Amino acid sequence: MKQIRYTLLVLLAALFLFPYGAGATDAEVLQKDLKIQDVFQRYGRKKNVTMVELSNEMLETYGMTRYKSITIKNDPDALRFTRQCLEADQKGARKIKEVTDDGGVISAYYQLPGKEADINRFVLFKVSSKGVITLVYIEGDLDSDDLIT
């Protein structure tokens, strides 16, 4: 379990530290009840955007059923839209971490209500000092400690 946690931590750290690396694959639609799915749909195929979705083989390795991320370079309209979607989705969510600056969220970690008893859902969000937006959606048989330890 420690190896899985360590590997997952490295994967998440790589996403936040090197957001431009991986190529995008065709996106499968997120849960229909989440507004952040609109961010993936609206910006996923635009210039200066990297979208990542892990294959089933990778997901099983980490105890996940879905992993999807998007990185958007310096787009103020996308930032406003993403923050609006996050605000809508965080209602009813467990706020694990949230950092604001000048009235706007710059870093957030939410646990959303699950659709199935043993499947948890998480949203991670970060805006870098250079204006790079990173949004991550994770579903799986994980708890918040698995993602932060």
Language-model regions, residue ranges each:
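Bacterial N-terminal signal peptides that target proteins for export
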Residues: 1-8
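Early exported N-terminus immediately downstream of N-terminal targeting peptides
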Residues: 26-81
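A low-complexity, Ser/Thr/Gly/Pro-enriched, surface-exposed linker/loop concept
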Residues: 76-93
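Sec/Tat signal peptide C-region and signal peptidase I cleavage site
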Residues: 18-26
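Bacterial N-terminal signal peptides
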Residues: 9-18
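Surface-exposed, polar helix/loop patches in the mature regions of secreted/periplasmic/lumenal proteins
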Residues: 88-148
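An acidic, glycine-rich, mixed-charge low-complexity segment common to nucleic-acid enzymes
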Residues: 5, 49-51, 91
